[in-house]
Curated annotation (Swiss-Prot):
Keywords attached to this entry: Aminoacyl-tRNA synthetase, ATP-binding, Cytoplasm, Ligase, Metal-binding, Nucleotide-binding, Protein biosynthesis, RNA-binding, tRNA-binding, Zinc
Origin species: Methanococcus maripaludis (strain DSM 14266 / JCM 13030 / NBRC 101832 / S2 / LL)
Record EC number: 6.1.1.10
Family membership: Belongs to the class-I aminoacyl-tRNA synthetase family. MetG type 1 subfamily.
Underlying gene: metG
UniProt subunit comment: Homodimer.
UniProt xrefs under CDD domains: Anticodon_Ia_Met, MetRS_core, tRNA_bind_EcMetRS_like
Name listed for the protein in its UniProt record: Methionine--tRNA ligase
Length: 663
């Protein structure tokens, strides 16, 4: 049986953080190493995703070309993966001739098979920049929480957004308000595959249950998929001069193109007529649907390709029980971690801390505790005691007559065999936590045996040899089973044993062992916590400076008197105030404008009590286009001044009737 293992493509707009390592790369590497350890034919391919708006944005901000950003972060990401001992048979990039050619072949085949069609859509267009604006090129106010938001996502409340949902949208290049225009995009007829995708998911026995459940929920309401974008940087759509393929149709094709780079062997892994191969995709939870629904849909549309056997989806990682944020520097970068600790410690911690399919947290205190009291006090203790005692007493691993072993010796060796079989089964089910727990249990048994036998007190040399032989067998099994999880530390243990990576004890001369597992000190943890807080504070300072610039008007364009004259400002009086459900900031306000009453949604919770607002005369912009905030329509805007945390509504210094115009 052949195995193809793939990892989600890392996006080249930044280096890797611990969340990437936990959900995707470490488990995929453990799985690959283990299959290779068992002598099975397996290749591991991965790479970087090099196209899309975030990369062009970064390039524009830095005044460089997109390829410069791609080159920088492709190399940085590969260095991060190398530092974690993540091994690939090929690590490619989507901005390469073979990938672009393969992606265009896939697209053309989808079109030939009737799965691509044209459709008019509404999209923001900036007159000043003379360009259609992709989602990340538009920013504004989130309609749900009133926080600053991008066209695809609100960092404040975490909601996915469409650009046209933003309140007061503006082009990030020139700050002008874009208009909505109609344009033609290309769509993938995914809805036509609803029944076949459902059948595929339901009949994939190796697909994890949580992935099946998520995929089936999406398939129930399957829609066609916009697969083109009005940008220049990407894989050009065949026959189209002004659009490129959306990254989520072309990036997964990288799994095929990167395998192609290994030669004709790619056919034995990917083509439909090769029944003796399995495909396992390791990904993060946030892109489960893309791999369990969209990607299989593409493969079905092409025809002739094998479907993935398993989509192994790793849960989210929080940091100190808070959502990680790269913009706020609330994150631990891989580079910073490996400069301070062994990468094996991270591999161990992530796999033992929670099942892969569950969300989990990285806490510096928990990390220290698990490494010191579990890994070192159990596994480190047994391996060190066995090596030191055996080397000092015999100089080599003793070889004994197996028929002379006592029942307690045979029982422990039998436990080793049972553990090996159980670990094998668990790893093949992607259950890395329980597999690692079985190895820890075996080390506990070894510690108990060592302590109970008290080899330092045994006077009979033959019996002492039997005891230390038994301990050496346990040690060899631990090294063998742990090697996929902790390749660095087990390589050192194997070097001191002077053995090969298998389950046989040969009696070779031992090397004088040194301490392999060193404890994580309180000083180490204090330093890492301090570094995290410093980085976060630095990000907050930058954010504050940016906010001050916006508030001070540095980004505002000059307008003429005619433009100002188009704004309908009037005196209004607040009649009713109530909190908007599901919002921590918003009031629903009914205001009297003299000739009519208006409903206005405003983020004044925390600045004013509801009772304080009733009866107050305020200035209202009356000709704003209505917008929905948290599902409640707002038909205007109250004018207010703001400085840091202080918000003050604008009012009149003389009493005027409601409806009076402001000039």
């Amino acid at each position: 049986m052949r195995h193809l293992v793939t990892t989600a493509l890392a996006y080249t707009n930044g280096p890797l953080h611990l969340g990437h390592a936990r959900s995707t790369y470490i488990p995929a590497d453990i799985f690959t190493r283990y299959l290779k350890l068992k002598g099975e034919e397996v290749i591991h391919v991965g790479g970087t995703d090099n196209h899309g708006v975030p990369i062009t944005l970064t390039a524009e901000k830095e005044g460089v070309k997109p390829i410069d950003i791609v080159d920088r972060y492709h190399n940085a990401i590969k260095a991060d993966l190398d530092s974690l001992n993540i091994c690939f048979d090929n690590f490619g990039r989507t901005h390469s001739d073979i990938h672009i050619e393969t992606a265009q072949e896939f697209y053309s085949k989808l079109k030939e098979n009737g799965y691509i069609y044209e459709k008019e859509i509404e999209q923001f267009y900036c007159e000043k920049c003379d360009m259609y604006l992709a989602d990340r090129y538009v920013e504004g106010i989130c309609p749900f929480c009133e926080g600053e938001a991008r066209g695809d996502h609100c960092e404040v409340c975490g909601r996915h957004l469409e650009p046209t949902e933003l309140v007061n949208p503006y082009c990030i290049h020139c700050n002008s308000k874009p208009e909505i225009k109609r344009t033609t995009h290309y769509f993938f007829k995914l809805s036509a595959m609803q029944d076949s995708l459902k059948e595929y998911i339901e009949n994939s026995p190796e697909m994890p249950e949580h992935v099946k459940n998520m995929a089936l929920r999406w398939i129930e309401e399957l829609h066609d998929w916009d697969v083109s974008r009005n940008i220049k940087w990407g894989v050009p759509i065949p026959g189209c001069d002004d659009q490129v393929m959306y990254v989520w149709i072309e990036a997964p094709i990288g799994y095929v193109s990167f395998t192609k780079q290994l030669g004709d062997i790619w056919k034995s892994y990917w083509l439909e007529n090769t029944d003796d191969s399995k495909i396992s995709h390791f990904i993060g939870k946030d892109i489960t649907v893309h791999h369990a629904v969209f990607w299989p849909g593409i493969l079905k549309g092409i025809g002739g390709y094998k479907m993935p056997n398993a989509v192994v989806s790793g849960g989210y990682l929080t940091l100190e029980n808070k959502k990680m944020s790269t913009s706020k520097n609330w994150v631990v970068w891989v580079k910073d971690f490996v400069e301070n600790f062994s990468s094996d410690y991270l591999r161990y911690f992530f796999m033992i801390n929670a099942p892969l399919n569950r969300d989990t947290d990285f806490s510096w205190d928990d990390f220290q505790k698990r490494i010191n009291t579990e890994l070192i006090d159990i596994i480190g203790n047994f391996t060190h005691r066995t090596l030191v005692f055996t080397e000092r007493k015999f100089g080599s691993t003793p070889i004994v007559d197996l028929n002379q072993l006592k029942d307690e010796d045979k029982k422990l060796i039998s436990k080793c065999d049972d553990t090996e079989k159980l670990v094998d089964s668990l790893i093949r089910e992607y259950n890395f936590k329980d597999a690692l727990m079985e190895i820890i249990h075996l080390a506990k048994e070894g510690n108990g045996y060592f302590q109970g036998m008290a080899p330092w007190a045994i006077k009979n040399e033959e019996r002492l040899k039997e005891v230390m032989y038994t301990c050496s067998v346990v040690l060899k099994y631990i090294i063998y089973l742990l090697s996929s999880f902790m390749p660095e530390k087990t390589a050192l243990l194997l070097e001191y044993m002077n053995e090969e990576l298998d389950l046989k004890v040969r009696g070779n001369p031992l090397k004088k062992p040194k301490v392999i597992f060193t404890k994580v000190s309180d000083e180490d943890i204090s330093r890492m916590k301090e570094n995290l807080m410093k980085a976060t504070k630095k990000a907050e300072t930058k954010s504050d400076e940016k906010s001050k610039k916006v508030k001070s008007g540095e980004k505002m364009d000059i307008i003429d008197i005619d433009y100002f004259g188009n704004i309908d400002l009037r005196v209004g009086q607040i009649l009713e105030v109530e909190e908007v459900p599901r919002s921590k900031k918003l009031y629903k306000i009914i205001a009297d404008l003299g000739d009519e009453k208006r409903q206005i949604v405003s983020g004044l919770i925390g600045a004013y009590d509801a009772e304080e607002l009733v009866g107050k005369k305020v200035i209202i912009i009356c000709n704003l286009k209505p917008a929905k905030l948290c599902g409640v329509e707002s038909q205007g805007m109250l004018l207010a001044a703001e400085d840091d945390s202080i918000v003050s509504l604008l009012s009149l210094d003389r009493d005027l009737p409601v409806g009076s115009k402001i000039h």
